[in-house]
Amino acid sequence: MITREFDTIAAISTPLGEGAIGIVRLSGTDSFAIAQKIFKGKNLSEVESHTLNYGHIVDPQNQEILDEVMLGAMRSPKTFTREDIIEINTHGGIAVTNEILQLAIREGARMAEPGEFTKRAFLNGRVDLTQAEAVMDIIRAKTDKAMNNAVKQLDGSLSNLINNTRQEILNTLAQVEVNIDYPEYDDVEEMTTQLMREKTAEFEALLSNLLNTARRGKILREGISTAIIGRPNVGKSSLLNNLLREDKAIVTDIEGTTRDVIEEYVNIKGLPLKLIDTAGIRETDDLVEQIGVERSKKALQEADLVLLVLNASEPLTDQDRQLLEISKDSNRIVLLNKTDLEEKIELDLLPTDVIKISVLHNQNIDKIEERINQLFFENAGIVEQDATYLSNARHISLIEKALESLQAVNQGLEMGMPVDLLQVDMTRTWEILGEITGDAAPDELITQLFSQFCLGK
C-alpha cells in the first residue's frame, strides 16, 4: 500500500485570485499518469524531462475543455521533491485553477497539506530543515537584503557551518572512544584534558560567534522595530506617512486622533524598518485613548529604535521633558518638526544631534534615513558580504542549548573529571546541533514546522 507520505499530492501553488498565471502542482509516483488523464496534447510518457508542453486540460468524463495550458513535466530525482512533478500553468483565476485541481484529485491525486511539497523535499534528502525554513523566509522577505540572507541559507551556508561543526565534534568523540577501547594504539593521539579543553574552546568560539549574529539576523528577518513617539499633534502620523510615501495614518489638527498603535514596514537601504506610530503619550480621561497610550508605552519599551518628535515652534512642555527622560536610554533619534515656523524650542536643553525636519514640506526626511543607516548598518557592520546570520528563533534557541552543553564540559574539566566522563555532554551538543539541520529532529517538530507553510509549497 502507498503510504500517505509518498502518494501523489496536488495543490494550487499560486495565490488565489485573478492573475495572469495560475499553477496547479502535482508530486508523486503517479503525477504523469494522472496528468495524462486530463491533458490533451503530447503523450507525457514520451516527453523529455524538464520541458514545457502545450495543450488543453480536458474533463475525461465529458471531454469539456477547461483551459489552454502549458504543462511542465519534470522527472525524479532532479526535482524539488525528488519525485515526479507536473506543473500545469493555466490562466490565473479562482474558478479555472480550482476546477483543474479538483480534476487531478478526482483522477487519483490527494490534496496536499500545507508545506507538504517542501516536507517531501526534506524527507527525500533534497534539503535539510534550515534550507526548508529558508524557503519560507524567501517568501516572507520584505527587502532584498532579507531575501539575500534567506537565499544564502537555502544554498546551505548555515547547514555547512553546522554540519562541519558536528563532524569535528564527532571526530573528538571518536578519538575519546579509541583511547578508551584501544589504549595500546600509539598512532592515535591521546585525548588529554588539555586537548579536550582546546577542542571545547574551539567549538564554543564558533557557536558564540554565530550566536552574536542573531541580533542582526533578527533585523534582517523581522525589521527594526521603530516607535514614533511624541505628545499629541506634533506630526507623528505625518512623519509615518512621509517615510512610507503614502497616507496610512489619519492626520488632523485634533489632539488624540491616533488612538491606537499603527504598524507599517518601509524599506531603508535594503533593510526592513517596522514603523510603529503610537498614540500621543499624555494624561487623558478618554478610555479608548488611554488604552492607546498604554500600548504606546509598551511599544517604546520593546522598540529597537525610538523616533522622538518634538514641536520646534513651541517651548518644551512637561510632556516633552517626560518623553526625553523616559527615552534617554533607548536607541533614539530626536526630531524637531515644524521648523518651517518660527523656532521657539529651547535647543540648549536638547541633545546636540537632533535632526530638524518639516513633515509638511517633506524637508530633511532623507537625513532620518541616513541616520538610521549609520546607527544600525554602517556602525554595526550589518550585512557583511557572504556572512551567515542567525535569524530563526528555533536556531537561536538550539545554539544557546548547545553552548550550555559545552559549558558543562568545561565545568567538568575544571572539576578534574576524566575526559571519558564528559562524553555525555559533548554528545548532547552534537545531538542539539543535529536538531537544527533535522538530522536529529523529532517527528513532532518536523510536522509542526511544515504546517506553518502555505498550501502548494
From Swiss-Prot:
Q: Which cofactor does it need?
A: K(+)
Which positions are annotated as binding (6S)-5-formyl-5,6,7,8-tetrahydrofolate? 25, 87, 126, 457
Which Pfam families does the entry mention? Answer: MMR_HSR1 (PF01926), MnmE_helical (PF12631), TrmE_N (PF10396)
Instruction: Name the residues that bind K(+).
Output: 233, 252, 254, 257
- Which GO biological process categories is it annotated with? tRNA methylation; tRNA wobble uridine modification
Query: What does this protein's record comment on cofactor binding?
Result: Binds 1 potassium ion per subunit.
Q: Does the keyword Ubl conjugation apply?
A: no
**Primary location recorded for the protein, binned into one broad class:** cytoplasm
Q: Does the keyword Cell membrane apply?
A: no
Q: Where in the cell is it found?
A: Cytoplasm
Record-annotated TrmE-type G domain positions: 223-377
Q: Which GO terms describe its molecular function?
A: GTP binding; GTPase activity; metal ion binding
Q: Which residues form a coiled coil?
A: none
Q: Per UniProt, which keywords does this protein have?
A: Cytoplasm, GTP-binding, Hydrolase, Magnesium, Metal-binding, Nucleotide-binding, Potassium, tRNA processing
Cellular component (GO) terms are: cytosol
Question: Per the UniProt record, which EC number(s) apply here?
Answer: 3.6.-.-
- Which PROSITE patterns does this UniProt record tie to the protein? G_TRME
Residues involved in Mg(2+) binding: 237, 258
| Binding residue positions for GTP | 233-238, 252-258, 277-280
Its biological purpose:
Exhibits a very high intrinsic GTPase hydrolysis rate. Involved in the addition of a carboxymethylaminomethyl (cmnm) group at the wobble position (U34) of certain tRNAs, forming tRNA-cmnm(5)s(2)U34.
UniProt lists the family membership as follows: Belongs to the TRAFAC class TrmE-Era-EngA-EngB-Septin-like GTPase superfamily. TrmE GTPase family.
Listed under subunit, the entry gives:
Homodimer. Heterotetramer of two MnmE and two MnmG subunits.
Q: What is this protein called?
A: tRNA modification GTPase MnmE
The organism of origin for this protein: Streptococcus sanguinis (strain SK36)
